Amino acid sequence: MTAEKALPLGNGKAAEEARESEAPGGGCSSGGAAPARHPRVKRDKAVHERGHWNNKVEFVLSVAGEIIGLGNVWRFPYLCYKNGGGAFLIPYVVFFICCGIPVFFLETALGQFTSEGGITCWRKVCPLFEGIGYATQVIEAHLNVYYIIILAWAIFYLSNCFTTELPWATCGHEWNTENCVEFQKLNVSNYSHVSLQNATSPVMEFWEHRVLAISDGIEHIGNLRWELALCLLAAWTICYFCIWKGTKSTGKVVYVTATFPYIMLLILLIRGVTLPGASEGIKFYLYPDLSRLSDPQVWVDAGTQIFFSYAICLGCLTALGSYNNYNNNCYRDCIMLCCLNSGTSFVAGFAIFSVLGFMAYEQGVPIAEVAESGPGLAFIAYPKAVTMMPLSPLWATLFFMMLIFLGLDSQFVCVESLVTAVVDMYPKVFRRGYRRELLILALSVISYFLGLVMLTEGGMYIFQLFDSYAASGMCLLFVAIFECICIGWVYGSNRFYDNIEDMIGYRPPSLIKWCWMIMTPGICAGIFIFFLIKYKPLKYNNIYTYPAWGYGIGWLMALSSMLCIPLWICITVWKTEGTLPEKLQKLTTPSTDLKMRGKLGVSPRMVTVNDCDAKLKSDGTIAAITEKETHF
């Protein structure tokens, strides 16, 4: 991969250098000689090029790997069943059109236009809202610490699958209690009503006693689970080597990590729909209950699922888009990827609920008693269903391999985008030698040690705090509101449409522009307010209540990202010289080196005779594209 050298066009000194380069062999000579090199290029000879994707497939697979993750398998199907089956698709499609696609496209196009990571892209389009970039990276830093814990659990389960009998299929192990009952072998006449009430399944005891060794509460952190610590180390090692060479390594790894889960999902789908009772499970999954649409919580669940599953407001899409060629048709890519993501979620529901229907059929209980979401589905419900199948170790192996690959590319793309943001802020520091690789190593080591606290006996309580507060839907909605305000009103939706037209050759439908300006921020603000009004303190398993300081930690993690935006606005306005209108004028003016490089603009990579003639003003300076379209 190579990246072309750039000669930015601007006023003042930049214009002088451009005119001085018109010597023989310069960029604007009439002889058609090679373009001039910017003097800085020679001084920074040791600075590595930023790089690009080798081809479109690498970009598409990287984005697909990031957005298609565990939430598609363990969250969407359960939400669909819980919120009216097929009726849930109505609010889901509304949010898909009004929030999912517009914000997804906004972030991807912004990265492609600026060729910058998740922080510097906002600095270039509107310095006043650079805090958006910091907010996204704080959320991403939280995700990098806790999301990979799920991979550690999955690796531990996978390591226990290579046996003739799965260890969570039977009682009698050292971690089982006297209340352990194998329900598939249950003879009700041998148990009293009281003993059945206290009975627990071997799969539940394996999860709570063997894997988590869970304590009584967050107050009792307990000992480190060293086996899980080794699994976490393995996960971080794999993650590091997937991204240590940037797009050169990531672009190759995603050919496997983004496609393999589809093979596993197809196999599990075929197996699931052929099981007895599968049809009942699918019916519960899709049977429409239109009366549920009157419940506001159904609409909130649909909106938050869109934000969770599309990886928006994390800076990932901006970072991945920044490695695209300038003229890549990012609009077409975004529409295709959004449809692929939602389609995968829908199909995954058949694979999951067919198996849950089978489990309910085998146990003779309603599906409502076996349906789970989140870790409960991945590590309790589905493993329990697998024990009822012939060749159960094989199906368990395939399932946990699918989980690992689904989570792995989501994890390393998150780390890659955080690294991209840092490197783009300090390119002369980190694009030399092996400094970028050392930065990735440092972030991985720090995140690993921070994650160890979630692998203690009380670690599950901390994990739930991260999941419910640090990367909650409330934080994502808050960031989305400001993203839309910045692009739709401050930078200007029409100007951004000009930038997009310059990149892809045409203007997308006006609906997306109106979503940026009105619909998306309005909907997000409504859901955000609903979150605050209906807020209920987190309870683990709906039983354990956290101490006050536990909720305090959760809210600190949530506010650590959301406060970045208003704090940055206040600090920059205070530090900028001039009157308030002058300050706002400066802070809402895009960077002078932010240029359109296609047919509507001038390429900063190569300056030709025609370009120089077209852009030179009467006073000899080169025109800068800094006209404002602020809707204040």
UniProtKB/Swiss-Prot annotation:
Entry's Gene Ontology BP terms: amino acid transport; gamma-aminobutyric acid reuptake; monocarboxylic acid transport; response to xenobiotic stimulus; sodium ion transmembrane transport
**Keyword set, alphabetical order:** Cell membrane, Glycoprotein, Membrane, Neurotransmitter transport, Phosphoprotein, Symport, Transmembrane, Transmembrane helix, Transport
Q: Does the keyword Cell membrane apply?
A: yes
> What positions does the record give for glycosylation?
N187, N190, N198
Chief localization: membrane
Q: Which domain of life is it from?
A: Eukaryota
Residues bearing PTM Phosphoserine: S21
Identify a single GO molecular function assigned to this protein. taurine:sodium symporter activity
Alphabetical GO CC annotations of the entry are: cell projection; GABA-ergic synapse; membrane; plasma membrane; postsynaptic membrane; presynaptic membrane
Parts of the chain that traverse the membrane: 59-79, 87-106, 131-151, 226-244, 253-270, 306-323, 335-356, 389-408, 438-456, 473-493, 514-533, 553-571
The record's region (Disordered) falls at: 1-41
> How would you describe this protein's topology in the membrane?
Multi-pass membrane protein
Tissues/organs with expression: Widespread distribution in the brain.
- Record carries keyword Glycoprotein: yes
Q: Which residues lie on this side of the membrane: Cytoplasmic?
A: 1-58, 572-632
Activation/inhibition comment: GABA transport is inhibited by SNAP-5114.
Question: Catalytic activity annotated for this protein?
Answer: 4-aminobutanoate(out) + chloride(out) + 2 Na(+)(out) = 4-aminobutanoate(in) + chloride(in) + 2 Na(+)(in); taurine(out) + chloride(out) + 2 Na(+)(out) = taurine(in) + chloride(in) + 2 Na(+)(in); beta-alanine(out) + chloride(out) + 2 Na(+)(out) = beta-alanine(in) + chloride(in) + 2 Na(+)(in); hypotaurine(out) + chloride(out) + 2 Na(+)(out) = hypotaurine(in) + chloride(in) + 2 Na(+)(in)
- Intracellular or extracellular location(s): Cell membrane
Under SUPFAM superfamilies, the record lists:
SNF-like (SSF161070)
Extracellular-facing ranges:
152-225
Reported function: Mediates sodium- and chloride-dependent transport of gamma-aminobutyric acid (GABA). Can also mediate transport of beta-alanine and to a lower extent that of taurine and hypotaurine.
Query: In which family does this protein belong, per the annotation?
Result: Belongs to the sodium:neurotransmitter symporter (SNF) (TC 2.A.22) family. SLC6A11 subfamily.
Please report the name of this protein according to its UniProt entry.
Sodium- and chloride-dependent GABA transporter 3
Which species?
Homo sapiens
What does UniProt list as this organism's lineage?
A: Eukaryota, Metazoa, Chordata, Craniata, Vertebrata
Which gene name does the record give? SLC6A11
